[in-house]
C-alpha cells in the first residue's frame, strides 16, 4: 500500500500543514460515467485512499482524516449501504497489515455501535494492531457526523456534572474540546473536498473552525498525488489569520 522509497516532491513547498481532512466525493458519478453501478465507484475510490495515505505519509503530514461514511449515508439504498459495509471489511482485512508495516496508526472515529459485530471486531483488531505506531495517524470517519460528535461530547460533560465531578460553570471551549473526536491531535489545517460540491456536509464541525477549505472538481477515484500536491500548494499560499486581521492592517 505504501512506498517506503517514495521521495518527497521536489516541487512541494514547506507547506506547514500537519492535519488534512478529505471529503471523498464523486464515487457514484465516476461509476455512472463508466456505465457501472455505484459500488464499482466506491471500490475505485479505495485505490485513491491508498494513494492519499501514501502521499500524506511521505510528505510531512502528521494526520489524515477521511470521510468514509456519514451518519446520513444510512439513508442510501440498502444495496449500496451493504456494499459499502463489505468494502469496509475488505479494506480492513487487506490493508491494515501494510499500514502497520509502514508505521501508520489507524483509528476509526464515529459511532461504530450501529455496525454489525463482524465489522466492529475488525475495527477493534485493526486499531489494536496499529495503536503504538508513531508515523502518520489515519482517521477514518465512519458513521460519523459533526453534530453527533458535539452532542456526544456534551453528553459526557453532562454525566460528569450529574456525578458531581464537574460544575456547570467549569464548562468552557477547552473542556468541551477535550471530549470531541481527535482532540489529542493537531487541529485540522486543510479540508479538501473532491467532486465539485462546495459544502462541508456535517463533517468535523468543531475541528475545522479555522481550517482552510479547498474544493476541486476532480472526482474522488481520479484524485491523485498531483491533485493532493496542488491542494497543499494552495494551502501554502494562503494567509491564515485565525480571526485576526492582516499584519499592519488597521482598517476594520
Curated annotation (Swiss-Prot):
Q: Which residues bind substrate?
A: 26-30, 38, 42, 70-72, 74, 76, 193, 199-201
Identify the catalytic residues: 25, 73
Name the gene behind this protein: uppS
Recall the GO molecular function terms of this protein's record. Answer: ditrans,polycis-undecaprenyl-diphosphate synthase [(2E,6E)-farnesyl-diphosphate specific] activity; magnesium ion binding
Under the heading PROSITE patterns, the entry gives:
UPP_SYNTHASE
PANTHER family in alphabetical order:
DEHYDRODOLICHYL DIPHOSPHATE SYNTHASE 2, DEHYDRODOLICHYL DIPHOSPHATE SYNTHASE FAMILY MEMBER
What does the record give as the organism's lineage? Bacteria, Pseudomonadati, Pseudomonadota, Gammaproteobacteria, Enterobacterales
Recite the UniProt cofactor note for this protein: Binds 2 magnesium ions per subunit.
Keywords attached to this entry = Cell shape, Cell wall biogenesis/degradation, Magnesium, Metal-binding, Peptidoglycan synthesis, Transferase
Q: What class of enzyme is it?
A: transferase
Q: List the disulfide bonds.
A: none
Q: Where does Mg(2+) bind?
A: 25, 198, 212
This chain's protein is named Ditrans,polycis-undecaprenyl-diphosphate synthase ((2E,6E)-farnesyl-diphosphate specific)
